[in-house]
Each structure stands twice: as C-alpha cells, then as structure tokens.
C-alpha cells in the first residue's frame, strides 16, 4: 500500500467504525476498488487501525471506566452472545464476505432503521443514563449485536437498534454501542493475531504508525460529533444512506 491508500483506509475505519453504516462493508468495497489483496500485510494493517479505534473509545470514556464495576459487567454480558456465535460460526462468517451479502445487509439494515424510527417515541424511552441499563437489557442488546457477524450489518447499527427496542433513548443506546465495541473489537483483533501470528511483522512499520494515528483521531472526532448529532436528530439519514449504498453496490459491483 502507498501512503494515500493507508490514509484513505484509516479515515474510513475511523469514521465508519462507530457509525451505524458498517466499517467492514466500507473497507471491503474500498479495498476492492484499490485492488488490494487480502494478504498478511493487509491483515496486519486492518488489525492496527481497528486497535486504534479501540484506543479512541478507551480515551473518550476513561472516566466512566474507572472504578465502575457495574458498567463493566453490563459490557461483558452484552459481549457473551456475539462471542459465542463468533467462536461457533467464524468459519461460516468468513465465507460471507462477498459484495452481494454486504450489499443485502446494507439494505436490510437501512430498512430496519427506518421502521424503528417510524415507531420510536423519544419521550417514552425513559432510560437516559448508562447506569440505568439492566443486565437483561444488556443481554438483549448483546443478542442484537450477534447479527453484526453478518458482513455489512454494522455492529454499532445492530446494538443501537437493540438498545432503542430495549427502551433506551438514542444517546444512551449510542453510548452503550460505543462501549460494547471494546470486547468485540478486541476479541476480533486477538483472534486475527492468533490466526496470523506467523505472519506478524509483515508490512511497512511507517504505514502501520500512520494508519494507527489517523484512525485514532478520526474515531475520536467521529464519536464526539456523532453524540452531538444524535442529541438533536434521528437515524433516518443513516437508514436512507444504507439503502442507497446497498443498491449502488448491487448495480455496479454484482454481476
């Protein structure tokens, strides 16, 4: 990869990881457009920029994490369903990384967002703080998160929808989605590291450093701006974007 490709992919990861539009789906499409082979170098790079996004969440929520055992329990509970499903079906999941499936997941996810928003009443969703989320709700959100194993679904999208259906307001559902990303992304990164341990070290170190820095700051900016956005607006634009993006993929990339 050249430096332009490194920066572009890092920006995409940083922006899309925490928006309900699937970072994996965007990285797959852009990598295909750049004709980048899925080899050891590419795998190491993707692990690096994903870890950068994890660090961005840790930095942004460092005060909430400190000495907050209850929050950690809820995050771990939400991880259990996707963790189990990932271990049981990871071989099948890797076979789903096709443009057709990504595009279909984009469209279906977009439709779900539009339906949920149509019937959503903010004033009736009385859970407005992370501390008020129950263990049962954490588990239900985790079950919704398991659907994100399907490429193109969006982990953040699945957890946000799950949170809204569990009586969380938009901002709280979004924040819990950010925090719930930590064990999922960390587990996915560790799984890739173990799987490709013999290939670690492949690639240009300077590319990895640049990718990490760009992804970290883009993720941090996205988290802050997205929370401000969702305090005033809804997820309808993201639903429409997902549908349009999925249709474009089917029209131009599926033969």
Curated annotation (Swiss-Prot):
Its main location: membrane. It catalyses: di-trans,octa-cis-undecaprenyl diphosphate + H2O = di-trans,octa-cis-undecaprenyl phosphate + phosphate + H(+). InterPro entries: UppP (IPR003824). Its EC number is 3.6.1.27. The keyword Membrane applies. One of its GO terms (molecular function) is undecaprenyl-diphosphatase activity. Catalyzes the dephosphorylation of undecaprenyl diphosphate (UPP). NCBIfam families: PRK00281.1-2, PRK00281.1-4, undec_PP_bacA. This is Undecaprenyl-diphosphatase. It comes from Methanococcus aeolicus (strain ATCC BAA-1280 / DSM 17508 / OCM 812 / Nankai-3). The gene is uppP.
